[in-house]
Amino acid sequence: VSKDLKRGSSFLRATSSATVLWHCVQIVAATLVTLQPELVAAKQTNVLLIVSDDHHWADYGFMGHEHVRTPHLDRLARESRLFPRGYVTSSLCCPSLATIITGRYPHQHLITCNDPPEQRGVGRNTPDGRRLFIDGRERMNVHLEQTPTLPAMLAQSGYESFQTGKWWQGHFRRGGFTQGMTRGDRHGDEGLSIGRTSMQPIYDFVSHCRNDAKPFLVWYAPMLPHDPHDPSPDIVEHYAQCTQSKHIARYWGNIERFDRTVGDLLDFLDRENLSKETLVVYVTDNGWIQSMDKPGFAPRSKLSPYDGGLRTPIMLRQPGTITAGRSEAHVSSIDLAPTILAACGISPPPSLMGVNLLDESKVTAREEIFGECFTHTAIDLEHPEENLMWRWMVRGQWKLIVPATADGNVHQSAAKRWEARLVDPSSLEKFENAVVELYNIAADPEEKENCAVSHPDLVSDLRKRLDAWWKP
């Protein structure tokens, strides 16, 4: 450096001060690049993963709902690569969330149900019942620990990660998070306060990461719009003018409540000048059709193989990096882990079956997506086929649904297993009599007309593809 500075002095006698200044800047910059490359290294992408809970795919302003107010989600959609025809792999919270965090199907990560098996005649609130439940949940937690997770993979590249909201698999560290709110309860204990009482834990975590110059992943999975549907009275009053059902008004109100928290997060990123450095990802864990005359969900939504339980918009936003726009391609929550890893400069493991949604060639080349639905309470924690209710796939305009009882090769005694679990007779009869279903979801988005009988060759072709995918 000293020799260069002496040369700079000779330039001073022969040239203008402006020229000298320019040469000095070049010398200093070259020295810094040589000695301190970390000063000019590109910043790593941060990730904010937003997961709503029990949310129907059409209940957003940007998806065309005429009553539900979602201005902040609408903004996110405008600024995102939007996939309105997204799907989750399973229509139940626990297995769906496990897929999002691992990038693997439920039959791969083995978390197929919400709760572990029950024993005939043993209530969960009895000492024996509680022991069975705790032991079963521990086995489910171990399954997750044995599967690489998104936070664990990011940690290898120096990322800090923060779990908030819904989290079923024990202490947050068991999922690979470096920090978190959940200590081990079924839904998420302390984590469930996020979005309902405060957003401050997220702001504090991000500030901590900035102070330590660490890239971060935030898992924001509030129990919203999931029940209890208890929005503020003014919101309920507004929606009461739009529907005769108080239950629907409260559900819609919880969606608006969730939307406001999304606005809080986007505004926070703007204030902290983090928007361009942060990939924002949105998905819901499963669908929901609110019952009109009682709390709870209506048929053909949660826990079902229909779009009311499976479909979700998926959004990816990073201003200056991702071009906003809309894609009508069918995509899946199985794609989120490889997409996030790729956006962070990390090669996804070959074992992940999803595609990078930011690679248009891979999105358009894929011809079908797959999924599976299981019982709410497990029958067997080690063998996914024991809990299977339906397998399904989407290829082009067609959606195939295959009940477990319709496939002897996969599940010969499904009905007997259901009977052993003491399901009510009407449910067992309905399941035993289930048939293969085929829907043209482009022309029949509500899946009302089963075309399976009139298209036997198509059903046969799709069944072969579904069987080739299903490898428990």
Regions found by a protein language model. Give the residues of each.
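Active-site-proximal N-terminal segment of extracellular/periplasmic enzymes that hydrolyze or transfer
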Residues: V40-R81, S90, A434, E446-D457
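Short, structured active-site-proximal loop/turn typified by the sulfatase FGly-forming signature C/S-X-P-X-R
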Residues: H65-L97, G103-H109, E160-F162, R463-K471
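A short beta-strand-to-alpha-helix junction
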Residues: H65-R69, Y87-L92, P117-Q119, R139-P148, ...
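Polar, surface-exposed loop/tail segments
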Residues: T70-P71, I100, K166, K276-E277, ...
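Catalytic-site neighborhoods of secreted/periplasmic enzymes
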Residues: R104-D204, P299-S301
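Active-site His/acidic residue clusters
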Residues: I202-Y251, N286-P299
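C-terminal, low-complexity/hydrophilic appendages and adjacent surface loops
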Residues: L303-G308, T375-A452
